[in-house]
């Protein structure tokens, strides 16, 4: 525990270098998961701030984000956010999947920050680093509380998730949508069961996610789909892509767009190590094609 505490303090000192990541000023305690959370550990922190500004150089279509958790039990082998755990002295592998940082004061911080005079009321994106509806949200209810606060403040927001747990919050999402623009997007990279089990072992079945898209739209919450990431040699077949796009359109998705896999430093090594075990026939091809984070332009 001492090493984690030390690295946490170091992260505070480096906050100015990456403001979207370092937002905790006190590591309070840790809780070992039991029952359905067996094998997990939750690091409770008080966040110094919770609404973070996206760096100006970023190409994403939003300026502000909220992430109530760090780390993610969805355990997607390609997750670009894995290296954020290294700043706390934790690993990008099992630590990222099993040692989850919980910003226990997130709801209170959102309430204070959206009430501040300097806050502009801009759109806020949730789910940009880790899933706001990952398993531990069922325990902590932080995302539910944040949705309530943003709705009451008439502040527009969007949610990106892979989790059907979002359906638990149809009531507060519908109430928020009465006062502000609310949008949701599901990430559904494939309907291929083998690929899903291989690359997203902690996520709900993709067919259940498609049904969640239907239920959100039926409830009046606009919900689109990101077919992401598209994995070369795994989920990029014409029939595979047609299957997932057709299912999402039939479910009433407001939009369907695809994003190709990219592998940042650190994530690349983690993903390739997994691939060498599960699909050694593809590992060498990925090593060649992903010498950099993105596929060559000629292959996209």
Locate predicted features.
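Auxiliary Fe-S-binding modules of radical SAM enzymes
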Residues: 1-46, 52, 233-300
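A structural motif
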Residues: 154-155, 221, 253
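Conserved Radical SAM active-site core
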Residues: 33-70, 77-185, 189-197, 206-215
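Conserved strand-turn element in the central/C-terminal portion of the radical SAM core barrel
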Residues: 191-195, 200-202, 215-237, 261-263
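Internal, well-ordered alpha-helical scaffold/interface segments
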Residues: 207-214, 228, 239-242, 246
């Amino acid at each position: 525990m001492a090493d984690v505490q030390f690295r946490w303090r170091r992260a505070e000192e480096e906050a100015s270098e990456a403001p979207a990541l370092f937002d905790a000023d006190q590591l309070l305690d840790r809780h070992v998961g039991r029952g359905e959370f067996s094998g997990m550990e939750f690091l409770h922190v008080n966040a110094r701030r919770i609404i973070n500004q996206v760096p100006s150089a970023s190409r994403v279509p939003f300026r502000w984000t909220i992430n109530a958790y760090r780390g993610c039990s969805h355990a997607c082998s390609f997750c670009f956010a894995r290296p954020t755990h290294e700043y706390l002295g934790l690993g990008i592998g099992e630590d990222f999947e099993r040692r989850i940082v919980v910003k226990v004061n997130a709801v209170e911080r959102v309430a204070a920050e959206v009430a501040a005079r300097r806050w502009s009321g801009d759109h806020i994106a949730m789910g940009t680093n880790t899933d706001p509806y990952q398993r531990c949200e069922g325990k902590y209810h932080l995302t539910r509380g944040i949705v309530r606060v943003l709705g009451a403040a008439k502040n527009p927001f969007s949610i990106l998730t892979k989790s059907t747990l979002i359906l638990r919050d149809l009531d507060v999402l519908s109430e928020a949508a009465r006062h502000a623009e609310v949008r949701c997007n599901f990430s559904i990279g494939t309907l291929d069961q083998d690929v899903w089990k291989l690359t997203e072992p902690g996520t709900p079945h993709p067919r259940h996610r498609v049904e969640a898209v239907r239920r959100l739209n039926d409830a009046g919450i606009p919900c689109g789909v990101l077919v992401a990431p598209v994995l070369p040699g795994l989920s990029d077949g014409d029939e595979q892509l047609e299957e997932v796009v057709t299912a999402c359109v039939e479910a009433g998705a407001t939009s369907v767009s695809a994003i190709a896999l990219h592998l940042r430093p650190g994530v690349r090594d983690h993903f390739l190590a997994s691939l060498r075990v599960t699909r050694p026939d593809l590992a060498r091809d990925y090593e060649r094609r992903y010498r950099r984070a993105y596929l060559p332009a000629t292959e996209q």
